[in-house]
Amino acid sequence: MTGSENAAGKAGLEARARRAAPPENELQDDRWSYFGWAERPYFQAMRRFRYDIFRPLLIRLGRLGLRPNHVTVASFLAVLVGFPLFWGAKLYGWAFAALALHVILDGFDGPLAQALDQHGTAQGALMDMSNDVTGLVIVILTVSYFNAGAGPSVNVFIGTVYAITYLYLTIFAVAQNLLDIRYAYVVKTKYPVYILLLCKWLFAFDLATPVMALASVYMGLSAFFGFLRVARTLR
């Protein structure tokens, strides 16, 4: 066997090994997330389901030069620019369309990375999580402070507390994962709140505010106990 054939065979084996390693990569990915151990099988199953459904499209997009970080940035810009701009102009339908685009694109970066054999990187997981959390904060602060008291806006105090407790919950959930501190799950209220905000606009019926108030209490307590577990581990 020639040297070039040997090198080609070795490269092929390495490529197959990389493709055969999703579980290990997924574990690395999950460390940079706010999912507990009981949630991870569901999270991974949903990620694989999205990949299986959209695999032909994802591969085609990858061949056109689209990369996961491009999708993440586009998702972030939709919620950073589109949502506050339309909400401030009282174009609530367009604001929710921008939010829907943010959510849809946010669900595509992971499967696209998997289609390109780039899944499981800590950098990609960090960008994805930052997009999730920052998007939530932008949405909540926008609906709290823009057009306050009008339309489908929410109480300023409750909205602010909700955004702050969500941030602290995320910080200590991720810290526990990075320190290998086991916790079962974290109740995530982001998507239910988005849906309730949409319902408030469509039907003028406000369930978003009381749900956010209750969720803030839960997230504050979860963040506090997460802080205690992290502090004990760092002694």
Over which residues does each language-model region extend?
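A feature for the membrane-embedded catalytic helix bundles of lipid/isoprenoid biosynthetic enzymes
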Residues: 2-58, 129-235
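Residues at alpha-helix termini
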Residues: 64, 116, 178-181
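A short, mixed-charge helix-start or loop-turn motif at secondary-structure junctions
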Residues: 39-43, 64, 120
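Acidic active-site catalytic centers that drive phospho-/nucleotidyl reactions
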Residues: 106-109, 128, 132
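Membrane-embedded alpha-helical segments that form the functional core of polytopic membrane enzymes
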Residues: 68-123, 207-216
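Membrane interfacial helix-start motif at the N-side
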Residues: 55-68
